[in-house]
Regions:
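Short beta-strand elements
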Residues: 342, 439-454
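Short amphipathic, basic-aromatic surface patches that mediate peripheral association
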Residues: 364-372
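Short, surface-exposed alpha-helix to beta-strand junction/turn motifs within ectodomains of secreted
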Residues: 372-390
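Boundary/junction segments of secreted and surface-exposed precursor proteins
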Residues: 342-363, 452-457
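Bacterial N-terminal signal peptides
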Residues: 8-17
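Bacterial N-terminal signal peptides that target proteins for export
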Residues: 1-9
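Structured beta-strand segments within beta-sheet-rich domains
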Residues: 389-440
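Carbohydrate-active catalytic/glycan-binding domains of CAZyme proteins
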Residues: 23-345
Length: 457
């Protein structure tokens, strides 16, 4: 009996310790998520990581991340790395701007407020990245390029600006004008997306939307509230990006260790997609090796010329942050995980698509690594509103027609689910070798105009 009581006390103490640290809690998922098919949630886009070098256990880390491939992303036994993002330079190389601090710092991971931004470079988009320069003080950098070609690195409470990825970098601060509106949870953890006219959209930590004419001129808040999902969560680490079709946003519930995916036609009005955007357990290699990192934070994406995300990089840690102490076996790094890239596609119908539409014509483009005329499993394809195709429904293929190197697919209009609330159609299915295939396209009859940057004296 005494042993049972002692065991219960130990379990309660352990649970209290974790709760006190504020590191994890269990979130109940909506029941409807159980019916999502592959490709219905963003998390399905994470692909196995190519193997580089040999997996080793002769490195820091809890047993759940051993053995591992240290050449993925950036890793150094003498430094703890955290958030950052990658851009492809005009030199053809990949440039990672990441924050970090010495592993033997007096407070371990809690030394992060004094972190430094490093410039690391690799010939490959997934590393290994090697530090070549120091930018300056700052935490959780995000780099973007302005219309005039200059680069801007955002850090908490500051910025760095340069004509070149190689510097020199000039320190400064952003001007954030709430325009009389309530600022939502402060102005840290900012994330940026360049609009077609060269202006910039910003999402702040609390989910507020801001606009700037250039990215350096003042940002003005245009939203009255948060655009995040209306569910319980301790949200942070938003990442926003824009493609040739729409805006994308992922935000992380750090306490629940679950992230949410949203889409928007204009950057102001957002639609929450079902299913997890990411969660622990997504680091898997092509040879079957798994790295079970305790936490994934500071997601950023690497984009192609159409804005499509083809790689995610995360700050990861092997334990509770407060347990990462100086000169111990724990630390953090920044890793890279490939993403399935959406296909290039367009609707050829001229009239608005709805329940009365008889046939939907969709053009799928061929590109490097994808032959639209040979690679698709046509029987698996569904097209229509994401609310339908994410759950295995939607319009089915009626017939096909070749168009140059591309393919035009005629879908039956029945079951497309598209209405006035939809601004993008979704294609979902598989390739002939069983891999995920998806894509989004704009729809006829939809107004894609975006909110203007406020004019102020």
């Amino acid at each position: 009996m005494k042993r049972r009581i002692l065991a219960c006390m130990m379990v309660v103490a352990c649970m209290f310790s974790i709760s006190a640290y504020g590191q994890i809690t269990e979130r109940e998922r909506p029941k409807e998520w159980d019916n999502l098919i592959e490709g219905g949630r963003f998390m399905d886009r994470f692909m196995p990581i190519p193997v580089k070098g040999e997996a080793t256990s002769n490195v820091w880390g809890a047993k759940d991340v051993l053995p591992r491939y240290v050449q993925n992303g950036i890793e150094n036994k003498e430094f703890s790395y955290w958030g950052g993002n990658i851009v492809k330079g005009d030199d053809g190389k990949f440039h990672l701007f990441v924050c970090g601090w010495p592993e033997n710092s007096p407070k371990g991971h809690m030394f992060w407020p004094k972190s430094i931004v490093y410039h690391a470079v690799s010939d490959q988009h997934n590393g290994p990245f090697k530090v070549v320069d120091t930018v300056g003080k700052g935490h959780n950098p995000e780099i973007f390029r302005m219309k005039d070609g200059r680069y801007v690195i955002y850090v908490i409470n500051g910025q760095y600006v340069s004509d070149s990825l190689n510097g020199p970098w000039k320190a400064g601060k952003f001007t954030l004008d709430p325009c009389g509106k309530k600022i939502i949870e402060g102005t840290s953890n900012l994330t940026f997306a360049r609009r077609d006219d060269g202006s910039f959209l910003l999402i702040c930590r609390g989910g507020g939307v801001w606009l700037s004419k250039t990215g350096l001129t003042p940002f003005y808040q245009i939203s009255d509230g948060s655009v995040y999902p209306p569910v319980e969560g301790h949200f942070e680490d938003p990442v926003v990006w824009k493609t040739n079709v729409q805006y994308h946003l992922i935000v992380n519930d750090w306490l629940g260790r679950i992230a949410y995916y949203l889409r928007s036609k204009d950057g102001l009005n957002w639609k929450v997609e079902p299913g997890e955007a990411y969660m622990p357990g997504i680091t898997k290699y092509e040879d079957g090796t798994n790295e079970n990192w305790f936490k994934y934070e500071r997601l950023k994406v690497l984009q192609d010329k159409y804005g499509r995300a083809y790689q995610a990089n995360f700050a990861v840690i092997d334990t509770i942050k407060w347990n990462d102490l100086p000169n111990d076996r724990h630390s953090s790094k920044n890793i890279c995980i490939p993403l399935t890239k959406g296909r290039l596609m367009s609707v050829l119908n001229k009239d608005k698509i709805n329940a009365q539409t008889k046939t939907i014509k969709v053009k799928i483009e061929s590109e490097d690594g994808f032959d639209a005329q040979k690679d698709m499993d046509l029987k698996s394809l569904r097209f229509g509103a994401s609310e339908e195709v994410n759950f295995g429904k939607g319009s089915k293929v009626l017939k096909t027609k070749k168009s140059g190197d591309d393919m035009i697919i005629f879908f039956k209009g029945e079951g497309n689910g598209l209405n006035d609330k939809n601004f993008a159609g979704k294609l979902l299915g598989k390739t002939k070798d069983g891999k995920l295939l998806f894509g989004y396209c704009r729809l006829p009859g939809v107004d894609y105009s975006e909110p203007a940057v406020p004019e102020k004296d």
